[in-house]
Amino acid sequence: MKGSVIIIGAGVSGLYAGTLLEKAGVDYVILEARKRTGGRVLSGQVLANTPDGVHVDMGATWFWPEIQPDFAHLVHQLGLTPLPQGRPGDMLYERQTTSPAQRYPAYVTSPESFRLQGGMQALTSALTRQIPAQKIKSDHQVVSISLLGEGMQVATQSETGEGSLFTGEHVFLALPPALAAKMTFEPALPERVLSHWRKTPTWMAPHAKYVALYQTDFLQAQHLCGDVSSRVGPMVEIHDVSEPDTGKTAIFGFIGVPAKSRWTVSEAELKRLCREQLVRLFGEDAAEPEAEWIKDWAADPFTTTEFDLQQDVGHAQPQQIPAQEEWADKLTGIASEWSPQFSGYLAGAIDAAAEGVGHWLRHVARP
């Protein structure tokens, strides 16, 4: 198959890059290892049997319009509805299991954070609709990238081992640098570049999220905003992510136990421990969720590498390809981690994709 441009990854950055190339009239293909689009944007509806009309984000969730105006502008352009994070009420602080959590007036964050009506999947779905279906190849894990004359050849492998080859003149890396470093490059990329990529933290990689959905809005009845900070766990940071006008409560928490420790118990046991914590915090109203989910990003091979489990979480910008060597003008990193301003954030995915595609169109693309 031929295409002027090959995008590796169908997360936010890859999909947005596709829409920009589509508008520019450039031939392209998007190769995605997973059997779905969205990358680190993931809804509970995709995970398992979410009740109709309810959307819960198991991955990237928030944006900050005041400091991320380009992302906010895209949300507006796509006709999506921002939801302010939080609601009126007190927050809780859990110090120990032997005494009730303490209530405090909730503080107002600045800048204010927002979610999207319909979850962040509303964003990826809107971007996907702007791309012809045949240009997105799911279940195509890239295993190697080779220089081929003046062009490039990309080899992929499906879950069943079926291989495919794609050729183009440029590759956009819309996946975490640590995952890009696991691919085979022929000729080899400079080791200093690969080493830097391997050590670049992947945002979300160490995290696990738990979400519980309830049939009643008990937070309002208890005059709570849903924000909790806990020194007990297993969840150390908890937020209300309910959608307006549903009459339901959706609560999510970051599980604070390190990945290799939480893997010593079953998912069912981890869910039980999370439910017990919610009962301690909110009472028997939280004992029996209508639905519950856990997404452990550390166990996702298309997100996390062993390096991610060995280092602190952070926002570190990886190196791009050296401009003077044989790979010059052949590869561009556009995943969120490559954003100089919002590395690791949703806005960073838009920022890096816009910068990378714009530079290629202005300075590299053949007329």
Report each predicted region and the residues it spans.
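Conserved flavin/dinucleotide-binding core of flavoenzymes
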Residues: 4, 13-16, 24, 45-47, ...
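Glycine-rich Rossmann-fold phosphate-binding loop(s) that bind the pyrophosphate
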Residues: 9-11
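Glycine-rich FAD pyrophosphate-binding loop
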Residues: 22-49
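N-terminal glycine-rich dinucleotide-binding loop that anchors FAD/FMN and/or NAD(P) in oxidoreductases
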Residues: 44-72
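N-terminal FAD cofactor-binding segment of flavoenzymes
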Residues: 61-89
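Short beta-strand to alpha-helix junction loop
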Residues: 62-68, 108-128, 137, 265-268
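A conserved short coil-to-beta-strand element within the FAD-binding core of flavoproteins
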Residues: 138-153
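Central helical "cap/lid" subdomain
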Residues: 158-223, 285
